[in-house]
Amino acid sequence: MNRVNTVEIGPITEAHIESFHKTLDVVARERRYLAFLEAPPLESTRAFILNNIAHGYPQFVATVAGEVSAAEVSAGEVLGRDVVGWCDVTPKSRPIYAHCGVLGMGLLPRFRGQGLGTRLITRTLHAARAFGLSRVELTVREDNRSAIALYEKVGFVTEGLQRNGALVDGEYENIIEMAILL
């Protein structure tokens, strides 16, 4: 079932924190996409989001109203108008990199492959440009072909390769460095 039409995309709010944390944890525990293998503690996540909100950093969430199945709930996913995906750009803190941001994003498995990632990243990059950033960077595991295709589709280019840049479950993985000029 295509659920993209029932999904809303909007800026993250304090009300999204717990749902965002649950979704982040589901994606992290897949051990295939993020730099961490489980979500940070809820209070760390809360501090990150509240800081993003306070500074006006681009952070958008995809939410859905009550269409997540019972099987997804038992797998740790969420119900209600809750977060099913996110995309954020956090500006770098050093003065010479103040024009740069770092992109992070994720989607619950059931919501992948339906164009939602494109909607999220497009909205977030537009907000990053409006925020004053002129460069956005990301890293992605080399075997994450669908994410790489998405990033290339919206204009990211490969700038480098970190050989054996990640070690997960005893297996090394290459990390691709990508960026887009806004």
Feature annotation, model-predicted:
Residues 135-141, 152, 157-173:
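Conserved catalytic-core motifs of GNAT/GCN5-like acyltransferases
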Residues 7-20:
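A short beta-loop-alpha structural element at the N-terminal edge
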Residues 114:
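Flexible nucleotide-binding loop
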Residues 11-14, 26-28, 32-110, 121-123, ...:
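Acetyl-CoA-dependent GNAT
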Residues 2-3, 173-182:
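Terminal substrate-recognition subdomain of acyl/acetyltransferases
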Residues 121, 128-139:
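Conserved GNAT acetyl-CoA-binding A-motif
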Residues 117, 121, 144-147, 164-170:
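Short glycine/proline-centered loop/turn elements that form peptide/ligand docking sites
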